[in-house]
Design a protein with these regions (language model features):
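Active-site-proximal N-terminal segment of extracellular/periplasmic enzymes that hydrolyze or transfer
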Residues: 1-42
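Secreted, luminal/periplasmic, and some membrane-associated catalytic domains
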Residues: 6-10, 27, 41-47, 53, ...
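Structural motif
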Residues: 14-16, 197-201, 245
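Short, structured active-site-proximal loop/turn typified by the sulfatase FGly-forming signature C/S-X-P-X-R
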Residues: 25-69, 112-114
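His/Asp/Glu-rich, glycine-adjacent segments
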Residues: 65-213
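Secondary-structure boundary elements
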Residues: 105-110, 188-196, 228-243, 271
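Acidic, His- and aromatic-enriched active-site or binding-groove loops in soluble protein domains
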Residues: 130-159, 220-228, 262-281
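Short glycine-enriched, charge-decorated loop/helix-capping segments at active-site entrances
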Residues: 214-219
Length: 282
């Protein structure tokens, strides 16, 4: 959106369209392309965090620090005390360093942030947060659900939007439904709370880029789908005079040679292999 001379845009929304690269701008993404090439839009290249993984990239964006500084060196890590691997942990306290919204609060005490499905979103200092969080029963049963802050937000938003389509967020059935629900949750929060900063995670494109590869013709369908979801959000926020920023965590490219570290480690005799249900585990 183009603001007049001297006119300020006091609020912003950041749409994290995972996997989006400059090469995707074009006929399959007309609305994202229009934003990037509009007077209000300024297209910039970002050197991705290393390693190029969701948790590391997001923590880098939100702290302005490198993984070696904020401590999120991957989507998981090996705990040498417990001798266990820990993946996709949720506590925001794992991210070392001041978060973007905390920095902004030093200048504006009433600054409010909504963090929607960006990771490390439990026990966060963000004012409004929603994140995937299954419920685990005493009988071992697992129920798909979300966690929110404030806690009562979870009941209200599920009442209005329905259950979060968890199977379309992770796993073999991952698809556009989860990004659509997240986009609707961003509208819901904006209409009721008008945060100064909204962080919105839209993962759909990344699914098919990893599932099929970046040059597969089916990527065109994924591009059109996420362009529609993101485009509707762009229109919605611009109509409310909220500045729209679109970014990506990393890009997916073709590889010429595959390396399998665990196979090489096993060949060298560096791994202890355990049989579980007929499968090899470390």
């Amino acid at each position: 959106m183009n603001y007049g001379e001297g006119e300020q845009c006091p609020r912003a929304v950041v749409l994290n369209v995972v996997g989006l690269c400059r090469r995707h701008l074009g006929p399959d993404t007309p609305r994202l392309t229009s934003l990037a090439r509009s007077k209000a839009g300024r297209e910039r290249l970002i050197r991705p965090a290393f390693p190029a993984l969701t948790c590391s990239a997001q923590a880098t964006y939100l702290t302005g620090k490198t993984p070696s500084e904020h401590g999120i060196v991957g989507n998981g890590w090996y705990d040498r005390t417990l001798n266990e691997h820990h993946f996709w942990k949720q506590s925001n306290q794992l991210v070392q360093g001041e978060k973007l919204w905390e920095s902004l609060r030093r200048d504006r005490k009433d600054f409010r942030c909504a963090k929607l499905f960006w990771w490390y979103n439990m026990y966060s200092s963000a004012d409004y947060s929603i994140t995937p969080r299954p419920l685990y029963g005493s009988d071992g049963n697992k129920v798909f659900d979300v966690h929110s802050q404030p806690l009562e937000l979870r009941h209200k938003i599920k009442r209005d939007l329905g259950e979060f389509p968890f199977p379309s967020f992770w796993g073999p059935t991952a698809g556009i439904d989860s990004s659509q629900w997240i986009a609707e949750s961003a509208r819901w929060i904006e209409e009721r709370h008008q945060p100064d900063l909204s962080l919105v995670y839209l993962p759909h494109l990344d699914y098919d880029l990893q599932r099929f590869g970046p040059n597969d013709p089916r990527i065109k369908t994924a591009l059109r789908a996420i362009d529609e979801v993101a485009g509707d959000l762009i229109d919605f926020f611009e109509e409310r005079r909220v500045r729209v920023i679109v970014l990506s965590e990393y890009g997916i490219t073709e590889v010429r040679r595959t390396i399998h570290p665990n196979r090489e480690f096993r060949h060298q005799g560096w791994l202890n292999i355990k049989d579980e249900f007929g499968l090899d585990t470390l």
